[in-house]
Design a protein with these regions (language model features):
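ABC ATPase NBD coupling module
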Residues: 7, 14-38, 64, 186-191, ...
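Conserved ABC ATPase "signature" region
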Residues: 11, 16, 72-91, 200
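ABC-type ATPase nucleotide-binding domains, specifically the catalytic core motifs of the NBD
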Residues: 17-19, 23-29, 56-72, 82-87, ...
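Short catalytic/signature loops enriched in Gly
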Residues: 18, 87-90, 181-272
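Conserved ABC ATPase signature
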Residues: 95-100, 104
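A short, proline-enriched helix->beta-strand linker immediately N-terminal to the Walker B motif
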Residues: 115-119
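P-loop NTP-binding/switch modules centered on Walker-like glycine-rich loops
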Residues: 122-126, 130-211
Length: 272
């Protein structure tokens, strides 16, 4: 079986000492994982161990990275559950995941991820399995934690509504490649890449009730057999021969707005 870490290309460097996480040893990664970098997974019910109490699962991360007693770690677990909005945390800390709702399990995952005050929190579709009411509460909680603790959040989502509510800066990816990056307000008001425009046009609108939703024709290319040209070419309404022959390069729209698209590149040349 392959190892748990496979790096195909590129570096992931830590600012303070330049440590490349892509080539770091297992011991170095163990110190960073759950401590400096934490993650909230998409399915809380399947990410938590069903035969271990939620308190013990939070305590495990604290005891791994900090020199504290079990009593201190349990008190921290209770405090963390309270911080993420769980009522009666002193009782819930001894509950098993199956005794909690999906929303409460997601809050437990957030408490666990924040237990060692990480610098970076990776949230992979953190609200997908939740109803809209709980989703709004979780997003509000993430915004609160971001503002109060200074933790950076890398949010992975397909929901543009979630992006608008939480993100400061957005990278739009297609077939594993960034095609547009911009501050969130700029991206929503001035999308440039045809894929980004297609995503925006596919959003349902309350002002146009009953209107059929727009879709992007075609399907994502097989990641094992990616085309040599633009990955979006086969689905793009503006495709040209050039798009199928090579990869587009970075086109600067504004200081923090960049697009990888031949069409946009030509438009900027004409304007400029």
């Amino acid at each position: 079986m392959p190892g748990s870490k496979i790096v195909y290309m590129g570096n992931v460097d830590r600012d303070e000492d330049g440590l490349n996480l892509a080539t770091a040893t297992d011991e170095q990664i163990r110190h960073i994982r759950g401590n400096e970098i934490s993650m909230i997974f998409q399915e809380p019910m399947s990410s938590l161990n069903p035969v271990i109490t939620v308190g013990d699962q939070i305590m495990e991360n604290i005891l791994t990275h900090e020199e504290v007693s079990k009593e201190e770690a349990k008190q921290r677990a209770v405090e963390l559950l309270a911080e993420v909005g769980i009522s009666r945390p002193e009782k819930v800390v001894d509950n098993y995941p199956f005794q909690l709702s999906g929303g409460m399990c997601q809050r437990v995952m957030i408490a666990m991820a924040l237990s060692c005050h990480p610098k970076l929190l990776i949230a992979d579709e953190p609200t997908t399995a939740l109803d809209v009411t709980i989703q709004a509460q979780i997003l509000s909680l993430m915004n609160k934690l971001k503002n109060e603790t200074g933790t950076s959040i890398m949010l992975i989502t397909h929901d543009l509504g979630v992006v608008a509510q939480v993100a400061d800066n957005v990278n739009v990816m297609y077939a594993g490649k960034v095609v547009e990056t911009a501050p969130v307000e700029e991206l929503f008001s001035n999308p440039k890449h045809p894929y980004t425009v297609g995503l925006m046009n596919s959003m349902p609108s309350l002002a146009e009730e009953g209107k059929r939703l727009n879709t992007i024709e075609g399907s994502v290319p097989n990641p094992l057999y990616l085309p040599k040209g633009c990955y979006f070419a086969d689905r793009c309404p503006y495709v040209t021969d050039r798009c199928k022959e090579g990869q587009p390069t970075d086109t600067k729209i504004k200081s923090r707005h960049h697009v990888w698209c031949f069409k946009v590149e030509e438009e900027m040349k004409q304007e400029g």
